[in-house]
Regions:
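The two-metal-ion catalytic cores of nucleic-acid processing enzymes
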Residues: 1-219, 225-341
């Protein structure tokens, strides 16, 4: 764990101090012993008439700002990025990631600077530039995958719909096979959290946050970073639109499950093609490069660049901090109910 002592600020009786409010009034610093202590201090005095508590209360971002003052010059080559895609049995239809009932039968993970590593369940002779790990069963496959993951410790994992499907399915499937919280091995700190929400207003979606690993979904990144609506956001359509390329065609087999049962070699090639297409999209579009530049400029997490509130709050906080100005107290807004005749 990281020991950090954040500060808050209160109005000063002195005529001048190193810190000032947004309106120029001098402030005194209040040194707190921990982030928990800082939260309690703010909660205790917030909203009390005549007592103002100044200072930014997103302590992760104040820590980054204190730890890395000034402009951050980052080395993009030092950031380890990989594209991930998994395949599951689908005899009973498309598997639900929140339940993860079906067996994982292939995983491809492609470092941006290394060969693709494929974990599968059968013999495969390929001329493509891949490293193939032939596993005895699904438990062996997931064990080998976790071992590789922990050996590499990628900073960013991307892929097409990787956040809502691949990572959610993997985490739930690992827990189903190896016990509750076994998926936490995918975090360098053995810590995670999950949240559920309705996507598009109706689709129940579960997302895992693996502490220490940034999951940056290329589908969401593409949606955010392009300025035209597409007819479809399936990888096959977008790859054809942007690159003139498509996913591997298996129409002669009718379904992905039939392909898996009858031509496992082609099934693995299909899996590999998906991660390669995402990497080629990034080579052309550079959206991950842009995300990194934005995050280091704002001193925030990569995922914060997807929204506007945290991103701009953090930029404003750092700008004001350089002027010796502390962010003003938050005001609670009462919700008024209006009767409509």
């Amino acid at each position: 764990s990281v020991s950090y002592r954040p500060n808050h600020f209160i109005p000063s009786k002195k005529s001048a101090t190193p810190y000032k409010a947004l309106d120029g009034r001098p402030l005194d610093v209040v040194n707190l012993d921990s982030m928990g202590g800082a939260r309690k201090f703010k909660e205790k005095y917030q909203g009390i008439d005549g007592f103002e508590v100044h200072g930014y209360d997103r302590y992760v971002y104040t820590y980054i700002s204190d730890k890395f003052p000034g402009k951050i010059d980052f080395d993009a080559n030092a950031i380890k990025i990989a594209t991930l895609d998994i395949e599951c049995e689908s005899e009973n239809g498309f598997p639900e990631p929140g339940e993860a009932i079906e067996k994982v039968n292939a995983i491809s993970i492609k470092s941006f600077v290394k060969s693709c590593v494929v974990f599968g369940l059968g013999e495969w002779e390929t001329e493509s530039d891949v490293i193939y790990v032939n596993c005895k069963n699904e438990a062996h496959l997931l064990t080998e995958f976790i071992k590789y993951w922990r050996q590499e410790w990628f900073d960013i994992i991307t892929g097409w719909n990787v956040d809502a499907f691949d990572m959610t399915y993997l985490c739930n499937r690992i827990d189903r096979l190896f016990g509750e919280d076994a998926h936490k091995k995918l975090s360098p700190w053995n810590m995670s959290s999950s949240r559920e929400f309705l996507q598009n207003g109706y689709q129940k979606t579960q997302i895992f946050d693996l502490y220490g690993v940034n999951i940056v979904d290329y589908l969401e990144l593409y949606r955010k970073s392009t300025f035209h609506n597409q007819e479809s956001y399936k990888l096959d359509y977008i790859a054809h639109f942007e690159l003139g390329k498509k996913k591997l065609d298996y129409s002669e087999y009718g379904s992905l499950h039939t392909l898996y049962k009858n031509n496992y070699a082609k099934y693995l090639e299909y899996n590999v093609k998906d991660v390669v297409l995402v990497e080629e999209l990034e080579d052309k579009l550079g959206f991950l490069d842009l995300t990194q530049a934005m995050a280091y400029d704002a001193k925030c997490n990569y995922i914060d660049t997807f929204g506007m509130v945290k991103y701009w709050e953090t930029i404003i906080y750092n700008f004001l901090k350089e002027q010796g100005v502390q962010t003003p107290p938050q005001k609670k807004h009462e919700t008024k109910t209006h009767q409509i005749a």
